[in-house]
Design a protein with these regions (language model features):
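Gly/Pro/Ser/Thr-rich low-complexity, intrinsically disordered segments predominantly at protein N-termini
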Residues: 1-138
């Protein structure tokens, strides 16, 4: 439900603009020290009109993962890999548990900064979107 709620909110927000959101069927191509790999984030947003591939994205500006609290390996591994994407401005991790709501935003500003929201509003600066934690779990 969390993924669907956020995906619908982002699609509505981005409609008619230069950015486009994709759900988990679109993979992201990541090159780490010459080693190419692919990941399937839950939601990915690109603003690059020159994306030339139908099945994967090379220039994401926002990546969202919906994770269980037990998915520490995913959190660490994916964040370490995603940091190598030069166009990535924000990496967002959202807890799937309604009893433990949490939105963690890793934002690149010269270096990566982290902020965590368990209630109230959160902003995805890369796409100018503001939402509430409660709406994700509604």
């Amino acid at each position: 439900i969390v993924s669907m709620n956020l995906s619908m909110a982002l699609h509505g927000h981005l409609k008619g603009g230069p950015c486009q959101a994709f759900k988990s069927d679109m993979k992201v191509n990541v090159d780490v020290n010459g080693q190419e790999g692919f990941y399937y984030p839950d939601i990915v947003v690109t603003g690059d009109p020159n994306e030339k591939h139908d099945y994967y994205i090379e220039s994401p500006k926002l990546i969202v993962e919906i994770l269980s609290q037990n998915a520490l390996r995913d959190r660490l591994e994916k964040f370490l890999v995603y940091q190598h994407i030069p166009t990535l401005e924000e990496y967002v991790i959202v807890s799937q548990k309604a009893k433990e709501p949490e939105v963690t935003i890793h934002r690149r500003k010269n270096e990566w900064k982290r902020e965590t929201h368990t209630s109230g509003e959160f902003t995805l600066e890369s796409i100018g979107f503001t939402g509430t934690v409660a709406d994700l779990y509604d």
